[in-house]
């Protein structure tokens, strides 16, 4: 039976299969032996081991059109790279590294600067024009005030999008604002270090902006 890995946690892979069910699967040992790890987004074949408990085994991984290391995902159409305007302050060298990584894997990137309410109009305009002139679509948003969500929804429609960015920039808050099916844990900013604390520890496919 064919399906797609929609979540991976601690060696378990949750596969949404063609029969409409989601199976909790382990990967066959041959993948581990060959050091080829299944990724969220992989199209796979599974063998159903227990139809009642919805348990199975991943037996084959189909050819990938692309894959990323951080976050570890495969077969994405685009990336939404999220950075905050402040709290934490944007690390532009890190942003450039994210963009280079996406370019290397031929994954189109859209840049989202969240927490726009913490910046001046001059700062917003400067970053908008800087990255637009490099050919990137740029979205200014505020998860707190609900600004920019409509523009993000339009970008996400009909595409498998990987959300990337450092901790504390509002990735989970924006995801929660765009859908109600899954509640992502959100974290606080360290007052001492002015950095975000890791809250999202696994990759997962979440339906957003469906027609």
Question: How would you describe each model-predicted region?
Answer:
Residues 118-169:
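Canonical P-loop GTPase G-domain recognition
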Residues 156, 174, 206:
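Conserved RecA-like P-loop NTPase ATPase core
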Residues 65, 180-211:
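Switch I (effector-binding) loop of TRAFAC-class P-loop GTPase G-domains
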Residues 167, 172-173, 177:
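Walker A/P-loop
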Residues 1-92:
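N-terminal accessory targeting/assembly segments
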Residues 78, 108, 159, 209-211:
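Loop/turn-to-beta-strand initiation segments
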Residues 68-138:
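Conserved C-terminal guanine-recognition region of P-loop GTPase G domains, centered on the G4
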């Amino acid at each position: 039976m064919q399906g797609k890995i929609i979540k991976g946690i601690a060696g378990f892979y949750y596969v949404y299969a063609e029969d409409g069910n989601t199976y909790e699967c382990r990967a066959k040992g041959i993948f581990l032996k060959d050091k080829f790890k299944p990724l969220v987004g992989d199209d796979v074949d599974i063998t159903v081991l227990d139809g009642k408990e919805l348990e199975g085994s991943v037996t084959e991984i189909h050819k990938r059109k692309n894959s990323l290391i951080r976050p570890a995902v495969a077969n994405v159409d685009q990336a939404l790279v999220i950075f905050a305007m402040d709290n934490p302050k944007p690390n532009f060298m890190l942003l450039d590294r994210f963009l280079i990584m996406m370019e290397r894997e031929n994954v189109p990137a859209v840049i989202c600067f969240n927490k726009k309410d913490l910046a001046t109009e001059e700062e917003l305009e400067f970053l908008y024009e800087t990255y637009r002139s490099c050919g990137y679509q740029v979205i200014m948003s505020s998860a707190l005030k609900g600004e920019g969500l409509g523009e993000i929804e339009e970008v996400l429609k009909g595409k498998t999008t990987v959300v990337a960015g450092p901790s504390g920039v509002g990735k989970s808050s924006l995801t929660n604002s765009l859908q109600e099916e899954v509640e992502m844990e959100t974290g606080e900013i360290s007052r001492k270090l002015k950095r975000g604390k890791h809250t999202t520890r696994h990759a997962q496919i979440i339906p957003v902006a469906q027609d």
